[in-house]
């Protein structure tokens, strides 16, 4: 699982988790 923001870059804040 990777954390992305709304632009698809890897961040931890204000984003979402790729649960794959």
From Swiss-Prot:
Keyword Membrane among UniProt keywords: yes
Compartment(s) of residence: Cell outer membrane
UniProt-recorded name of the protein: Major outer membrane protein
GO molecular function: porin activity
Top-level taxon in the UniProt lineage: Bacteria
Keywords assigned by UniProt, alphabetized: Cell outer membrane, Disulfide bond, Ion transport, Membrane, Porin, Transmembrane, Transmembrane beta strand, Transport
The organism's taxonomic lineage, starting at the top: Bacteria, Pseudomonadati, Pseudomonadota, Gammaproteobacteria, Pasteurellales
Assembly and interaction partners: Disulfide bond interactions within and between MOMP molecules and other components form high molecular-weight oligomers.
Source organism: Avibacterium paragallinarum (Haemophilus gallinarum)
Major place of residence: membrane
